[in-house]
Amino acid sequence: MTTYTVRIGDLVLGPGAPVAVQSMTNTCTADIEETAAQVLELARVGSELVRFTVKDEDDARAVPYIRDRVRQAGCKVPLVGDFHYNGHLLLSRYPQCLEALDKLRINPGNVGAGEHHDSNFRTMVELIAQAGKVARIGVNAGSIDKDLLERGRRENEAQGSPRSEHQVFLEAMVESALSSAAAAQKYGLP
């Protein structure tokens, strides 16, 4: 698999670059003052990227104001928006949120289910690509594509000597990440 060097603000990630520390806020993102203060504190203690959830319209509306407060304080730490079930709607309705972020995280298993998954994912990716932003496909146990996992379980049961549930789960996570990355490239991300 090819890996790329990516610039996020002044930070470089990828081959040859040092490992970067990313932190995530634990504030309500809609609380602009509290979230901006925590971003600044995390940057002060060494975080090189700061991520916060963007789960609803209040959060999406707050993002540009958070960015403004952080930048007005002289802090250039890249801001990362973590999107889940409704990211396609939030990015469509609040382009200023997208513009204010340096990077976005997409959970492929939390972008919609069944027939809506592909169109929701595609909408997010196309908006991110059009804005020239960086995205990360983030797969974890809480956001694995349930359909993909169930398919893996069915295929495993049909084998003469099935693999462990843990192995099936790990394989589904990898497949989810790789297939989502391929789809993201198809929809416009480099």
Summary of predicted features, one role per range:
Residues M1-S23:
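N-terminal amphipathic alpha-helix/helix-capping segment at the start of soluble metabolic enzymes
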Residues S47-S179:
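Active-site beta->alpha loop and helix N-cap motifs at the rims of alpha/beta catalytic domains
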